[in-house]
């Protein structure tokens, strides 16, 4: 399994102090069957606790996930700042997930080199 962050998500994670290990824990929870919301098209929404707090008032992360293959952390937000994503945004995210999941390894290498994605 390879773990990636999109550039905008990386900025969000740094700003909020979210460590990479916490992101890997989110995926481990999903692999054990704890999926908060399957939004379709390989797009999932998972809750992520703030440091020292619970999940209910924490963060929501949108990720593109195919079990045993790849995960891309695409978007994150604090629940206090945003209730949910719009249908329009979800449509865009599904298309982005489709494109990223179909990329061959060579293309991922180029994206990594150019800073479009960051590997965890």
Language model features: what each stretch is:
Residues 16-18, 22, 42-44, 95:
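Sequence/structural signature of beta-propeller domains
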Residues 64-118:
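Enriched for short, Lys/Arg-rich terminal
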Residues 1-2, 52, 101:
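Surface-exposed, interaction-prone regions with an acidic/low-complexity signature
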Residues 4, 18, 57, 69, ...:
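Charged, alpha-helix-enriched surfaces in structured cytosolic catalytic cores
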Residues 7, 19-28, 50-52, 91:
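Polybasic/polar functional segments that serve as interface/processing modules
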Residues 37-77:
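Basic/aromatic recognition patch in beta-strand/loop cores that engages polyanionic ligands
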Residues 32, 39-40, 117:
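A charge-rich, low-complexity, intrinsically flexible signal that marks solvent-exposed coils, linkers
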Residues 1-18, 113-120:
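Arg/Lys-rich, positively charged N-terminal/basic patches that mediate binding to nucleic acids
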